[in-house]
């Protein structure tokens, strides 16, 4: 199936475009993959790892306020089987300005830590592998 080879972009709005992009680059070790200004009233920054099949896009619609995350259960989850990588990742998240929070769904606290960005969106670092 062709979709199995597609690149995934996860896009969301923010009122703090540059701060959020910097936060995710520092916290998750992402790089800025691209950006645009005033594209029909929208500014945006794409961040991720250049060789991976996914990236994040943060956008800001000029003159529009989007506010905070709609719920505490909007998550990005990253599985890190190595305990050393997981601990390093947790330290990077805090250094980048993410706030450690208790997960809305207690499942994520069993083997991971949940972090909240400036907009209230959450990232979970799970200290385990992913098995489909």
Identify the residue ranges that each predicted region occupies.
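N-terminal beta-strand motif that seeds the catalytic metal site of vicinal oxygen chelate
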Residues: 1-21, 73-78, 129-132
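Vicinal oxygen chelate
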Residues: 1-3, 9, 35, 90-132
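Core segments of cupin and vicinal oxygen chelate
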Residues: 12-54
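Exposed loop/turn and edge beta-strand positions of beta-sandwich/beta-sheet ligand-binding modules
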Residues: 41, 72, 109
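Short hydrophobic/aromatic beta-strand element in the GNAT-like acyltransferase core
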Residues: 44, 77, 112-114
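Acetyl-CoA-dependent GNAT
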Residues: 59-64, 127-130
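Short, conserved charged micro-motifs
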Residues: 84-89
């Amino acid at each position: 199936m062709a979709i199995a080879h597609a690149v995934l972009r996860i896009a969301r709005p923010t009122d703090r475009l540059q701060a959020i992009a910097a936060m995710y680059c520092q916290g998750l070790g992402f790089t800025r993959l691209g950006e645009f200004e005033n594209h029909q009233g929208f500014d945006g920054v794409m961040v991720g790892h250049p060789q991976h099949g996914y990236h994040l896009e943060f956008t800001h619609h000029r003159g529009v306020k989007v506010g905070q995350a709609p719920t505490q259960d909007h998550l990005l989850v990253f599985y890190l089987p190595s305990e050393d990588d997981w601990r390093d990742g947790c330290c990077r998240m805090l250094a980048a300005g993410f706030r450690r929070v208790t997960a809305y769904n207690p499942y994520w606290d069993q083997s991971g830590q949940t972090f909240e960005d400036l907009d209230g969106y959450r990232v979970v670092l799970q200290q385990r592998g992913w098995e489909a």
